[in-house]
């Protein structure tokens, strides 16, 4: 526990609040998130930290009849998090992925408080809210970087000089079929060489962070965040060779939607949609711009898996020292 005069992990003084700004985001569809946002806002303001919020979220809180203390109002966009030291997110993984769109351009770390279901990206739970606010005020947290991927869509396949769309993803980019009664026909390419053709429901291209999301539901492996790799997971592929693949982190993955197939659609983190007409080409590669996550504790990733997925570990004995340390 730090005192008000202790040095924080960023070289400042814990409790020092001069010119400090935190962007606060909440899931406006959850009453609990709106109540928590109001309490967090009041606590940070009392501590001398400027709170910035989106205009739409302030309006959602006011519609509940709650009165708001002074707050810095911004609109969503690339500059929403500019100049902030942290983005505090109240909600589930979907809310955190929305917040990542604001955090990535500014390089601001995300600190998630889970008010959803699994909340795999969140660092704290609802019952930890008061202590989480204290950690923010005292700068009692560390920051880790998570790999993201750049995504380029060429509507003319290899003949396109420039991509029709450029976007990115923290978890995954997923090419999916549009028509329920027809398969999407694609060819997978790794580093400029064709690997396999699949008739499938779709293909997930994921980061290690995304290995516990859509890729996991499709039968892909869980990859520790410290492992540098990219994943390719075919969904319900009608092929003998249709296994999840783990490829080098600097590999260039390409999916070509065959001209004779139905149109598809590309989803990035389940939020950004891009149409994939027949003949389109999707190229996916490691991005130079990571997303930063704030961590309150240095618990092993194994512990997070056990807690979030409620994995059965009863009967484990291990070494005596390991049992004693929990």
UniProtKB/Swiss-Prot annotation:
Location of this chain's protein in the cell: Cytoplasm
Catalytic activity, reaction form: NAD(+) + ATP = ADP + NADP(+) + H(+)
CC cofactor: a divalent metal cation
A molecular function (GO) term: NAD binding
Pfam families cross-referenced by the UniProt entry: NAD_kinase (PF01513), NAD_kinase_C (PF20143)
EC number: 2.7.1.23
NCBIfam families, sorted: PRK03372.1
Record function comment: Involved in the regulation of the intracellular balance of NAD and NADP, and is a key enzyme in the biosynthesis of NADP. Catalyzes specifically the phosphorylation on 2'-hydroxyl of the adenosine moiety of NAD to yield NADP.
Family: Belongs to the NAD kinase family.
Protein name in the entry: NAD kinase
């Amino acid at each position: 526990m730090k005192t008000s005069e202790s040095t924080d992990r960023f070289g400042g003084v814990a409790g020092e609040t001069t010119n400090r700004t935190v962007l606060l985001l909440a899931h406006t569809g959850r009453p609990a998130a709106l109540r928590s946002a109001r309490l967090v806002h009041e606590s940070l303001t009392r501590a001398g930290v400027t709170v910035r919020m989106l205009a739409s979220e302030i309006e959602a809180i006011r519609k509940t009849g709650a009165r708001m203390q002074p707050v810095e109002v911004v609109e969503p966009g690339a500059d929403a998090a500019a100049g902030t030291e942290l983005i505090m997110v109240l909600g589930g993984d979907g809310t955190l992925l929305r917040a990542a769109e604001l955090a990535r351009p500014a390089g601001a770390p995300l600190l998630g408080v889970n008010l959803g279901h699994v909340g795999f990206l969140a660092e704290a739970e609802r019952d930890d809210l008061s202590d989480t606010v204290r950690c923010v005020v005292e700068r009692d947290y560390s920051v880790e970087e998570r790999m993201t991927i750049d995504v380029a869509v060429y509507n003319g396949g290899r003949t396109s000089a420039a991509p029709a769309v450029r976007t990115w993803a923290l978890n995954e980019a997923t090419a999916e079929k549009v028509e329920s009664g027809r398969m999407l026909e694609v060819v997978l390419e790794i580093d400029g060489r064709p690997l396999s053709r699949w008739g499938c429901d779709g293909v997930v291209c994921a980061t290690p962070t995304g290995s516990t999301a859509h890729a996991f539901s499709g039968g892909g492996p869980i990859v520790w965040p410290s492992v540098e790799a990219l994943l390719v997971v075919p969904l319900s592929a009608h092929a003998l060779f249709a296994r999840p693949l783990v490829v080098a982190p600097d590999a260039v993955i390409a999916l070509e939607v065959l001209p004779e197939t139905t149109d598809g659609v590309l989803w990035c983190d389940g939020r950004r949609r891009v149409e994939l007409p027949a003949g389109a080409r999707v190229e996916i590669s490691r991005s130079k711009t990571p997303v930063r996550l704030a961590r309150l504790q240095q618990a092993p990733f194994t512990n997070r898996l056990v807690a979030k997925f409620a994995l059965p570990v009863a009967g484990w004995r291990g070494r005596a020292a390991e049992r004693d340390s929990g």
